[in-house]
Amino acid sequence: MRLALAQTAPVDDVARNLTEVADVVAGAAAAGADLVVLPEYAMYSKKAIDPSFALVAEPLDGPFVAALEALARRLGLAILAGVVERSGDPHRPHNTIVSIDADGVLVGAYRKIHLFEAYGYSEGSGILEGPDVAPEPVVLGGLRLGPMACYDLRFPELARHYAAAGTDLLVVASSWVPGPHKAAQWRTLLQARAIENTCWAAGVSQAAPISIGSSLLAAPDGAVHVSLDESPGLAVVDLDPAALAQERAKDPNLRLRRLGTPHPADGARMGGPTVDH
């Protein structure tokens, strides 16, 4: 699979953001990408959550997601992107990561579970958290993906849940706000999630000034294969399933856990048979 990390700089203008998304997705398609990942809140973004997010929120069959579906279908690549989804609460929409396959079909919608209530920021003041249930991986481009959103990265149990379900690639769509040590934390956490789950971890964050940028792909051994600076940009990298299988064969840590957590559902994908307690 050829993966494109699309580091955009969304603003508080849905139409303008859609134009930027269309341009960068076209660039990813021209580079031969099978999947392009866009940031959290790619549809609409501000430095702080306010009532305007509820005003612009759309259902999953609304015009913004429909435009993403049309892009995917026309250009023949899968898209993962952050949208503001209307919820049952008229004042608090969901922060949702949609997954659209290369045929333009919506195959997944992950609603952010862990809202950002830290560093003086309150995402929950205007965003409704997703259901407290284990999300399922989505299949795009022949790989199993585990969608996550920003602050989710700090909760290893979500990544481990995805790994136990056979996920090959963790995808963290983010708006990682700047601050002391935040860039180092972002990079370290992505590398840690990749190493401890022997999978790829792609982090795609908004560009400056709202976010730090610094989108990257961490390999299962923690090596950073591609990265961006704080400016808008596109990075393309090839993912080799054979290399993933080799790393899992060398380090079968997912099969060697002993603290009562479930083992991978498909042992063959983890580099060996499932071991029962």
Language-model features, listed with the residues they occupy:
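Extreme N-terminal starter segment of soluble prokaryotic enzymes
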Residues: 1-4
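Cys-nucleophile CN-hydrolase/nitrilase-fold catalytic domain and related Cys-dependent amidase chemistry
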Residues: 14, 22-103, 177-196
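Residue-level detector of high-confidence beta-strand sites
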Residues: 96, 109-112, 172, 227, ...
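C-terminal beta-strand edge segments of enzyme domains
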Residues: 206-277
